[in-house]
């Protein structure tokens, strides 16, 4: 690789909106603010919910549920 053309790689502080703070490396060279992190994201915390908006699943099963049981 060529020397002198790559940006500096430094340790920075990343702060989440939930208050979690950790250090990471970046070429940005300034502290960053995150909206979500692994401490508050629903996928990592296990608090993920699947919402049925407007009863669409029930409406689908009512209309087409009988078609699969005829076999």
From Swiss-Prot:
| Co-factor binding details | Binds 1 zinc ion per subunit.
Pfam families the record matches? Ribosomal_L31
Recorded GO CC terms:
ribonucleoprotein complex; ribosome
Q: Which cofactor does it need?
A: Zn(2+)
What is one Gene Ontology biological process annotated in the Swiss-Prot or TrEMBL record?
translation
The record's section on InterPro entries has: Ribosomal_bL28/bL31-like_sf, Ribosomal_bL31, Ribosomal_bL31_A, Ribosomal_bL31_sf
Name the source's superkingdom: Bacteria
What is a single molecular function from GO for this protein?
structural constituent of ribosome
Keyword Acyltransferase found: no
**Keyword terms of this UniProt record:** Metal-binding, Ribonucleoprotein, Ribosomal protein, RNA-binding, rRNA-binding, Zinc
**Which residues of the sequence carry a binding annotation for Zn(2+)?**
16, 18, 37, 40
What's its job? Binds the 23S rRNA.
Record family assignment = Belongs to the bacterial ribosomal protein bL31 family. Type A subfamily.
The UniProt entry, under HAMAP family, shows:
Ribosomal_bL31_1
Q: How does it assemble?
A: Part of the 50S ribosomal subunit.
Name of the protein described by the UniProt record? Large ribosomal subunit protein bL31
């Amino acid at each position: 690789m060529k020397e002198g053309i790559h940006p500096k790689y430094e340790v920075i502080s990343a702060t989440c909106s939930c208050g979690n703070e950790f250090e990471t490396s970046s070429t940005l060279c300034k502290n960053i603010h995150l909206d979500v992190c692994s401490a508050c994201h629903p996928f990592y915390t296990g608090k993920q919910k699947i919402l049925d908006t407007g009863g669409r699943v029930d409406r689908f099963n009512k209309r087409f549920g009988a078609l699969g049981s005829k076999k």
